[in-house]
Amino acid sequence: KRSDRETSNGCVLVKAVDGFAAMIAVKCETDFVANGKDFIAMVQEILDAAVAAKAKSLDEVKGLKLANGEDAAATVQQRSGITGEKMELDGYNFIEGENLSVYDHMGKHTLATIVQLNKKNEEAGHKVAMQVAAMKPVALDEASVPQEVKDEEYKVAIQKTKEEQVEKAVVAAIKKAGINANLVDSEEHIESNINKGWLTREDADKAIEIKKTVGAEKAANLNENMIQNIAKGRLNKFFKDNCLVDQEFQFSDGDKMNVADWLKSQDKDLAVVAYKRFTLSAE
């Protein structure tokens, strides 16, 4: 059944005209269709109509009338019928305002970005649009990260830190007992190392007992302040890796600096205001 088939190929196009930038994605099943000029021309026509209408949603785009007298959604379905491939008009992003830069990654029509700066600077805008493509930020800055994402990341960081502290104590106790901790790091390894003669059953039992008792004891006596401080450090690293302005800028000729500082180095008042990114590939 065509509706059950996977649409992992397609075409993403992006365009900016007079203070309005938009990108659109139409998915299909094979790169043969995705790279066909008729398919790309159809996506371009839908994008042109969306930009001309300054469309504000995917639903609005689907309803736009094209040159054939049909709306965009029907046109995609007709093309699907002609090629025999499932197709979906399923991605639309836009930014309205001045100082917009658009980027089609390597001209391959599979990944596109839009960036808006607070001042006109085409070269800087282009480089930041490339940064967004390469480094896939999840938010503009720390304040833009949804609270539930922050809470979840912090929770994961706390859990990971606790597990590491317990593991550290267990490994130290196993070493102190004169046992090689690498030989007893999992039940599977324990059995295989006994069979190879690298580990005695007695040492294995001792290590299992240490894991149980020292692990439980350490877990019950963790230093909460220390755990929270380490977790906060991890959360800050998450912001640094995932917030556009805090990411290390990838296209600087000189010193390492984050995106916000690089923009200031080009013009002390220059800053990024917004961005959009869409890709066909799973990341």
Annotate each predicted stretch with a short phrase.
Residues 1-283:
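N-terminal assembly/interaction segments in proteins that build large macromolecular machines
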